[in-house]
Regions:
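Nucleic-acid-interacting cores, centered on viral/eukaryotic replication and modification enzymes
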Residues: 1-168
Length: 168
């Protein structure tokens, strides 16, 4: 909202229903590389500071997806530090319910005792990182099956489009 001033329109047009418009004012606009670029430039110094303060952890980020890898206690401390930096310096707010902890070897109880916030989901099977699966063979297989199912549904929608131009 601050950068664009107005909500963006997301328009759907479906046979028998007509045109439907949904207003969206959250995050950068889809396809707006400028907004994403500015966001990345803004958080980069904070991510670098976090990495410098926690040298035994690896901090990976792509836009607003931040991943902290390391021993449970240090990773939990780094997460809390990231929450502080993001809130104090950018007036942002992390949503624990949108965060995940992947621990292939340690139980949920162990990572909770290390300081992981209670609102963060814990998985010992796997998680999604930058759009792809990371985890057990079963997790990756189920992830791939889900993608195939989604693409199959997308093809059903595309098939209903009246022109080839609208399909691209």
């Amino acid at each position: 909202r601050l950068m664009y001033g107005d909500a963006s329109s997301i328009v759907f047009n479906e046979a028998g229903i007509g045109r439907t418009e949904v207003l969206n004012s959250v995050g950068t606009r889809q396809g707006c590389s400028w907004g994403s670029f500015l966001y990345c430039l803004t958080i980069q110094p904070l991510l670098q500071q976090l990495a410098d303060e926690f040298p035994d952890c690896v901090v990976l980020a792509f836009a607003d997806d931040v991943h902290i890898l390391g021993p449970p206690q240090l990773a939990a401390q780094a997460y809390e530090r990231w929450r502080f930096l993001y809130g104090a310096l950018l007036q942002g707010q992390l949503n624990d319910s949108k965060s995940k902890c992947y621990s292939p070897r340690l139980s949920e109880d162990v990572v909770r005792r290390a300081g992981l916030p209670s609102g963060i989901e814990v998985s010992t099977e796997g998680t999604r990182v930058l759009g792809g699966p990371v985890g057990s063979t079963a997790f990756c297989r189920d992830f791939a099956k889900g993608i195939v199912a989604e693409v199959t549904e997308d093809f059903k929608v595309i098939r209903r489009m009246t022109s080839l131009q609208a399909q691209h």
